[in-house]
Regions:
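Membrane-helix interface and helix-disruption motif detector
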Residues: 56-61, 123-127, 181
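Intrinsically disordered, low-complexity regions enriched in small/polar residues
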Residues: 38, 76, 137, 180-181
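Generic detector of short alpha-helix boundary/capping microenvironments
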Residues: 1-2, 132
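Juxtamembrane boundary at the C-terminal end of a transmembrane helix
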Residues: 168-181
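Selected alpha-helical membrane-embedding segments in polytopic membrane proteins
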Residues: 2-96
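Hydrophobic alpha-helical transmembrane segments and adjacent short intramembrane/lumenal linkers
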Residues: 85-87, 91-170
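Short, intrinsically disordered/low-complexity patches at protein termini
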Residues: 43, 52-53, 136, 178-181
Length: 181
């Protein structure tokens, strides 16, 4: 299957999607460069859309917001990868295990990036889009089998990974907003 089919599968049916991702053996670098980074570019470009329906938003504000959003999600991947591999060193003992952890983080972040793109394209702060972020923990929980997390560590891993995936990009975005804007 292609990367985009994997993304669709993991979003629509996480349990099946993680199985498909496991079987597809698409290298993490390819997912990063063919899907994640292009989606981050679309996210950055979507920051210009509010200029069309709100005349008070300037080009420079949109540009800085786009740069901040791009880097907040881009850095989130690497920070979460470092934190998860230090919290759970057994998940990065082999190259295959490291690739699965990378896929787990990437596909979950791709879901969040798609939500942020949708949010930026809507003319108003449409709160139900933010509630869709609560679907991420379900996707993350279903992905624990993909990573072969031991049964006794599933809930702790699920809680830590869900919190990192949800909070870190938002915290970095807030930081960039304070520093840049």
């Amino acid at each position: 299957m292609s990367i985009w089919q994997n993304i669709f599968c993991v979003i629509t049916s996480p349990k099946y999607g993680w199985e498909v991702i496991n079987e597809s053996n698409i290298p993490t670098g390819k997912v990063m460069h063919a899907a994640y980074v292009p989606l981050l570019c679309v996210l950055a470009l979507s920051c210009f859309v509010p200029m069309f329906y709100d005349r008070t938003i300037s080009f420079s504000y949109s540009l800085l917001t786009g740069i901040g959003m791009f880097f907040s999600y881009y850095l989130s991947y690497y920070i979460i990868m470092c934190l998860m591999s230090s919290f759970y060193p057994e998940l990065v003992k082999t190259e295959g295990a490291t690739a699965r952890l990378s896929d787990y983080i990437l596909y979950n972040l791709i879901f969040l990036v798609l939500l942020m793109i949708l949010r930026k394209l809507l003319p108003d702060d449409f709160t139900p889009v933010l509630f869709l972020m609560l679907y991420l923990p379900w996707m993350a929980y279903q992905g624990t089998e993909h990573l072969f997390v031991k049964k006794e560590k599933v809930m702790k891993f699920f809680a830590v990974s869900s919190l990192l995936l949800l909070i870190l990009p938002i915290a970095l975005q807030y930081f960039f907003d304070l520093v840049i804007i």
